[in-house]
Amino acid sequence: MKLLKVAAFAAIVVSGSALAGVVPQWGGGGNHNGGGNSSGPDSTLSIYQYGSANAALALQSDARKSETTITQSGYGNGADVGQGADNSTIELTQNGFRNNATIDQWNAKNSDITVGQYGGNNAALVNQTASDSSVMVRQVGFGNNATANQY
């Protein structure tokens, strides 16, 4: 019986750790806006998915000291996120089912985007290119749609 408990616990630990991951990124060193040399982007891109049939596509390119975090819980959630902005963050949280988000932040230095969708069949489209800016979208319930553009 003890062996069965240990095996069950090990299966939970292994399956739980397979659900989370950090995605490696590449960005050039060299000079960047006269700021001197950099050995890398010094940024993080993390995707955490819990449940089933969730999908995430993320690109973080030439985004120094930036952070992108996608967390999806439930079933059938989708995310398409792109960032190419220095000192900026994107945080996407989707809980429920069939929520979809498309988020793009390019050339928007020192900017933040936060999107939270809770429920089902919600959709968000966010585009930001304005520096020193922030966008926040929060949707709770079912069948909500939001579009936010900040240039």
Swiss-Prot record:
Induction per the UniProt record: Constitutively expressed in agar-grown cells (at protein level), part of the csgBAC (agfBAC) operon.
Keyword annotations of the record: Fimbrium, Signal
Chief location bin: other
Signal peptide location: 1-20
Annotated GO biological process: cell adhesion
Pfam family, one: Curlin_rpt
UniProt keyword Repeat present: no
Assigned GO CC terms: pilus
Locations listed in the record: Fimbrium
Taxonomy, superkingdom: Bacteria
InterPro entries: Curlin_rpt (IPR009742)
Function: Curlin is the structural subunit of the curli. Curli are coiled surface structures that assemble preferentially at growth temperatures below 37 degrees Celsius. Curli can bind to fibronectin.
Family statement: Belongs to the CsgA/CsgB family.
Name listed for the protein in its UniProt record: Major curlin subunit
Species of origin: Salmonella enteritidis
Gene: csgA
